[in-house]
């Protein structure tokens, strides 16, 4: 009986058929895009889809890229263990989307760049660009290893498949369609995988609601179990999740993911116009809302079923990240094929993120290292290099899964990585975009300081996790279990057993204050430290006396919504009809706004009539 504890069924033949079929479709998209685009085998076509993508598929790809297997597995467990404060990320997603669309999109389109780190060389120097690219490569490789490992560990329990077999298979499929199809294959595969992910959540919620007597019962159980206490205005920065940590810290953390992260920027600059790029971010925002809502409802459904018999406390699972897969086999085993659909959903999330990461890693490596070192490379040579680098980074990410196995809660660990590394990088970009007095000396000093601080607190938090009173895990019960399960049901390779280590360690003085800082504040701390140190060093080293910097490298008033809305009609008309003197990247047919073309055409017709 579901919810009573004990071992659950494993995959049936039909589950394997559904799972394998969906994964083969994903790989087939890569092959299709490869054959379809053979005549357009340029580096730009491979890395940016020829800059001809439209808003909706790019938006779904943006959503799928970070709504990975970690989201499919980790977010429901978050709702089950901690309740619904995670829903406050709705506000963070809205703030992040506005910042990315209205500040960063105009800047990157104006500069007509492929790698976001090209901006660092334009604004500072070559050394800072190389450092920024290297930080991104390390961050993405580690994060991608975690994305591969965490769902593989969970799927290992319910399918019985060998852990390393799942890891290698994941990397192999991603390598195939990244190598052959490039960005178009990644985007269209993401669209397909996004549909599968949402379908998996819907299946869990629907079946759970039927078993519990409706969604009203699920909601009622969650209310009395304390899972619906969403709003906490406690200003304590050590509180894991509160209104302030999520809205302030979460907004800046997600902004660092979407505004400067190559795997995301690469998608929206592949759009055919700036309007499509901005629209893709706002549609993506809605996609994030829907995905997180379904994931949270899955977690609340899981709590309603297991409120009297927690599988983790009952030792039916070896890690909290295995809770949702356990639930799937507990409630969907009587419906052949549906467990396979869910596993495909988790696996699709992993494939989506891994493929996005590999494609972005190839882009920054080629643009920031290969092209500057060998500027005479032909398009054909670059295409072969792109494919070779896809294979290389796929292998690296599989290897990094071993490092990822040493992390704890996968959702928190994944977001912590972005806060530690992307936070200081976002501070460096904001410094360059808003402060004309900032120079390369100050930028380098600020970046080094910000990174040192975030690594210090992040690694410290990993070694000495916050005490339970700060994390506020909600109570669970095993009173309704048929019997306590004393056996370990999970089969793991030896290195993954570190997840079960609970040996107490002596805690240093900083463990209960500095190291207990909410992981969502890692990014704001990195931004603030980077900008303050950079401005001080820039002032000392003559930043205000430097030669005039290119004006297109800064954010102008016209880039911001608040100023744009105040413009009179005549000012807007003048702005549209006047083509920038230095073109600012708009002379490319990809970026040339249709309105400019129409205005110039109308002006010519008026002159002809006169």
UniProtKB/Swiss-Prot annotation:
Residues 32-52, 109-134, 184-193, 262-284, 364-390, 436-440, 541-610 are cytoplasmic. The chain crosses the membrane at residues 11-31, 53-73, 88-108, 135-155, 163-183, 194-216, 241-261, 285-305, 341-363, 391-411, 415-435, 441-461, 520-540. Keywords: Cell membrane, Glycoprotein, Ion transport, Membrane, Sodium, Sodium transport, Symport, Transmembrane, Transmembrane helix, Transport. It is found in: Apical cell membrane. One of its GO terms (cellular component) is apical plasma membrane. It catalyses: (S)-lactate(out) + 2 Na(+)(out) = (S)-lactate(in) + 2 Na(+)(in); propanoate(out) + 2 Na(+)(out) = propanoate(in) + 2 Na(+)(in); pyruvate(out) + 2 Na(+)(out) = pyruvate(in) + 2 Na(+)(in); acetate(out) + 2 Na(+)(out) = acetate(in) + 2 Na(+)(in). Residues 1-10, 74-87, 156-162, 217-240, 306-340, 412-414, 462-519 are extracellular. Acts as an electrogenic sodium (Na(+)) and chloride (Cl-)-dependent sodium-coupled solute transporter, including transport of monocarboxylates (short-chain fatty acids including L-lactate, D-lactate, pyruvate, acetate, propionate, valerate and butyrate), mocarboxylate drugs (nicotinate, benzoate, salicylate and 5-aminosalicylate) and ketone bodies (beta-D-hydroxybutyrate, acetoacetate and alpha-ketoisocaproate), with a Na(+):substrate stoichiometry of between 4:1 and 2:1. Catalyzes passive carrier mediated diffusion of iodide. This is Sodium-coupled monocarboxylate transporter 1. It comes from Danio rerio.
């Amino acid at each position: 009986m579901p919810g009573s504890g004990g071992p659950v069924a494993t995959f049936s033949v039909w589950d394997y058929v559904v799972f394998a079929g969906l994964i083969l479709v994903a790989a087939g998209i890569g092959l299709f895009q490869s054959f379809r685009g053979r005549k357009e085998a340029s580096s730009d076509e491979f890395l940016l889809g020829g800059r001809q993508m439209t808003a909706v598929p790019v938006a779904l790809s943006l959503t799928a890229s970070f709504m990975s297997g970690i989201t499919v597995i980790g977010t429901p467990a978050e709702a089950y263990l901690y309740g619904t404060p995670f829903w406050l990320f709705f506000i963070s997603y809205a703030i992040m989307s506005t910042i990315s669309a209205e500040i960063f999109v105009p800047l990157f389109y104006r500069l007509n760049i492929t790698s976001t780190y090209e901006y660092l060389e334009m604004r500072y120097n070559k050394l800072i660009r190389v450092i920024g690219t290297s930080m991104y490569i390390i961050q993405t490789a580690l994060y991608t290893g975690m994305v591969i490992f965490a769902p593989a560990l969970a799927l290992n329990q319910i399918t019985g498949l060998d852990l390393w077999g799942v890891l290698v298979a994941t990397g192999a499929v991603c390598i195939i369609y990244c190598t052959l199809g490039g960005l178009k294959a990644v985007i269209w595969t993401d669209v397909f995988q996004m549909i599968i992910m949402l379908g998996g959540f819907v299946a869990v919620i629907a079946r759970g609601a039927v078993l519990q007597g409706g969604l009203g019962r699920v909601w009622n159980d969650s209310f009395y179990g304390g899972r619906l206490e969403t709003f906490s205005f406690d200003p304590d920065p050590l509180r894991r999740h509160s209104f302030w940590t999520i809205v302030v810290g979460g907004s800046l953390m997600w902004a660092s993911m979407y505004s400067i992260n190559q795997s995301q920027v690469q998608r929206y600059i592949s759009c055919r116009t700036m309007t499509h790029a901005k629209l893709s971010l706002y549609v993506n925002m809605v996609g994030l809302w829907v995905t997180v809502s379904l994931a949270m409802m899955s977690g609340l459904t899981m709590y309603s079923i297991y409120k009297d018999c927690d599988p983790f406390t009952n030792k039916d699972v070896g890690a909290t990240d295995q809770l949702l897969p356990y639930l799937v086999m507990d409630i969907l085993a009587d419906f052949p094929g549906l467990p396979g659909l869910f596993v495909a959903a988790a696996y699709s999330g992993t494939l989506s993120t891994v493929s996005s990461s590999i494609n972005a890693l190839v882009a920054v490596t080629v643009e920031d290292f290969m092209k500057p070192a060998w500027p005479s490379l032909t398009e054909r040579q670059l295409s072969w290099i792109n494919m070779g680098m896809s294979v290389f980074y796929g292998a690296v990410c599989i290897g990094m899964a071993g490092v990822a196995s040493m992390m704890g809660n996968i959702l928190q660990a994944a977001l912590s990585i972005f806060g530690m590394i992307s936070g200081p990088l976002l501070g460096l970009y904001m410094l360059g975009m808003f402060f004309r007095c900032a120079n390369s000396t100050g930028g380098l000093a600020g970046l080094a300081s910000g990174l040192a601080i975030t690594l210090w607190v992040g690694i410290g938090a990993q070694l000495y996790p916050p005490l339970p009173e700060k994390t506020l895990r909600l109570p669970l019960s095993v009173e309704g279990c048929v019997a306590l399960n004393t056996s370990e049901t999970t089969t793991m390779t030896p290195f993954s057993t570190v997840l079960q280590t609970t040996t107490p360690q002596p805690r240093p003085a900083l463990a209960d204050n500095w190291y207990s800082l909410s992981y969502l504040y890692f990014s704001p701390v990195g931004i603030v430290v980077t900008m303050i140190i950079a401005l001080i060093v820039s002032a000392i080293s003559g930043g205000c006396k430097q030669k005039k910097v290119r004006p297109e490298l800064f954010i102008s008033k016209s880039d911001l919504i608040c100023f744009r809305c105040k413009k009179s009609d005549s000012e807007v008309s003048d702005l549209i009809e006047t083509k920038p003197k230095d073109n600012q990247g708009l002379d490319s047919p990809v970026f040339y706004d249709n309105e400019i073309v129409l205005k110039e055409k109308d002006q010519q017709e008026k002159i002809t009539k006169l």
